[in-house]
Regions:
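Catalytic core and acceptor-binding pocket of nucleotide-sugar-dependent glycosyltransferases
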Residues: 88-184
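Active-site-proximal specificity loops/subdomain of glycosyltransferases
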Residues: 1-30
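A structural signal for short coil/turn segments at secondary-structure junctions
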Residues: 28-29, 53, 141
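Conserved donor-nucleotide/metal-binding helix-loop-beta segment in metal-dependent transferases, i.e.
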Residues: 40-81
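Catalytic metal- and UDP-sugar-binding loop of GT-A-like glycosyltransferases, i.e.
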Residues: 36
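Long, low-complexity C-terminal extensions of enzymes
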Residues: 166-210
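Small-molecule pocket liners
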Residues: 17, 56, 95-96
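Short aromatic/hydrophobic "clamp" motif used to bind/position activated sugar donors
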Residues: 33
Length: 210
């Protein structure tokens, strides 16, 4: 119940990811862990990601400038909790991938819990969902000398659809491991991949997915 928010809160269900990671840390024994959104397709092994987990917490860094609407709102939330030094410019991390060693994730989730409690004490439930909490915790983690790294070598967020014409090569040239397909891509491309698997029992070849 640590991250319980009103049902009508924007991105209310996304807060469940914080609860899920906290539960896994408390109830499962493991060396390293990675939490992924469900609207993803993993196309390569995660061997290199596991190597980095021992050295840092890994999060997907969203390529947003400090003034981008969502990024600025996340920073304003932090300003409300820590007015000294405001205005802050937090790095915008997404919640589609959170990975690290058990020790590093335990420390990081403690920061998440404390930061969310401070937000709630100020009467703030971020409309930006779990991402606001990851970002605040990551900022504090870096200030404390506990590294947080961009996981963009392993995952990328591909917004596709009528409003997005996206050109990229990182799915096949020095390819990322995980394709994150939110929004329209979840309703079309990801569904086509799944339907192919359901019919044949194997995923389509990568050249067809691309």
């Amino acid at each position: 119940t640590t991250y319980r928010v009103p049902a009508d809160t924007n991105w209310a269900l996304a807060y469940y990811k914080l609860c899920a990671m906290a539960w896994v840390l408390e109830n499962r024994d493991f060396t390293r862990a990675a939490m992924l959104d469900l609207d993803t397709f993993t196309q390569r092994p995660l061997d290199d990601l596991w190597r980095e987990c021992d050295e840092a917490v890994l999060l997907y860094q969203v390529p947003h400038a400090a003034s981008q609407t969502m990024t600025a709102a996340i920073s304003h939330c932090f300003d409300a909790v820590e007015p000294d030094g405001a205005p802050h410019a937090l790095t915008h991390f997404g919640g589609e991938l959170v990975a690290g060693s058990k020790a590093r994730l335990t420390d990081f989730m403690s920061l998440c819990r404390d930061y969310f409690k401070e937000l709630q004490a100020k009467g703030i439930t971020p409309r930006e969902g779990d991402e606001a909490v990851w970002c605040g915790a990551a900022y504090r983690s870096l200030l404390a000398g506990k590294p947080v790294r961009a996981a963009n070598a392993y995952i990328f967020r591909y917004w596709l659809g009528v409003h997005f014409y996206y050109v990229s090569t990182n799915y096949t040239l020095d390819p990322v491991c995980i394709l994150h397909l939110p929004g329209a891509a979840k309703d079309r491309q990801l569904k086509l991949i799944y339907n192919g698997y359901a019919r044949r029992g194997v995923f389509p070849p990568l050249n067809k997915i691309y």
